[in-house]
């Protein structure tokens, strides 16, 4: 994970890096399950892939990287909040196609597995849909198997194409109900109707995380991250030089 973060920071050279986790230190039930109780019921309950999360969070903090969490919602919603509330260009690094709905002139999605960019200019070329609205409509029609959200029965690619091409295409009552339910599940602006959730995100983002090269090296020694230690100068230049420069600027001002 740390090497991946390093490679992305080197690739994109951001002014600020935020790590969003899909876990809940302040737990509240996922409100999407109120709409569909089977939502994500197909996901593995195996916690072993997350056993080192606390160590990773601590090390990220020494690198000046803030960790942000949801409470009632999910990591996707936190990312949506950041993209919509923060000014300037943003790059989301994720394989999750749900983030396609956030693509805009200021927001790009980068898939690190396929090494593909999804941006405003190339959206149709990369997705086959003219714009984000078309993509989102198609998703609401067809559902999402990975999230255990069923779509409209027998509504495949041909039906979606016909629906998008014909403004007069009418869904029947049961189809409308499925579409509306899916739109409610998939939308990433639910935080707008949850003031406490929105405030929770804002408070976390306001926390200033100071990078500490000494603490970073101490962690790397403690956990025998020999590969990082062998290239510690590179890590210093990438994460800690900027922090030192910012501190000097603060003093000067």
Task: Give the predicted meaning of each segment.
Residues 1-61, 114:
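Domain-level signal for Mg2+-assisted phosphodiester chemistry and nucleotide/NA-binding surfaces
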